[in-house]
A protein has these predicted regions:
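Helical scaffold of the NTase/Pol beta-like nucleotidyltransferase catalytic core
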Residues: 1-35
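Metal-dependent nucleotidyltransferase catalytic core
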Residues: 8-10, 19, 58-89
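Short connector loops at helix/strand junctions that flank enzyme active sites
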Residues: 30, 47-51, 77
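Conserved beta-strand core positions
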Residues: 35, 52-54, 82
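Catalytic metal-binding acidic patch
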Residues: 39, 44-63
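Short, charged recognition helix plus adjacent turn
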Residues: 93-97
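Short hydrophobic/aromatic patches at helix-to-coil boundaries
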Residues: 100-106
Length: 106
């Protein structure tokens, strides 16, 4: 059984990279692929109260149930609040910055 992350802080980028195979398998179980980290964790500036910003691709459009189930499964595994967004769901004014800073978990 995998040890849970400290609930007082989001996992570091290095921790997420070590967990990448598990995280990508989890995303695939809900129809997602290509998980990428952006935001404060990707920039190395996460604080104890920060959430974890993840970008995920879905071939086609995920159902609300698929999307929420993946979000909740990631939160349960990592024991941290996850802000999960899809590429298609990114607001146009944020898309370029987020895609530029997003770090693949592969």
């Amino acid at each position: 059984m995998m040890e849970r992350m400290n609930p007082q802080r989001p996992p570091s980028l290095d921790e997420l990279k070590r967990l990448a195979p598990t995280l990508q398998s989890l995303a695939a179980a809900y129809g997602g692929r290509e998980l990428r980290v952006f935001g404060s964790v990707a920039r190395g500036g996460a604080q104890p109260a920060s959430d974890l910003d993840l970008l995920v691709d879905f071939p086609g459009s995920p159902s609300l149930e698929q999307f929420m189930d993946l979000k909740l499964a990631l939160e349960d595994l990592l024991n941290v609040r996850v802000d999960l967004v899809t590429r298609k769901g990114l607001r146009a004014e944020l898309r370029e910055r987020i895609e530029r800073e997003a770090v693949p978990l592969a």
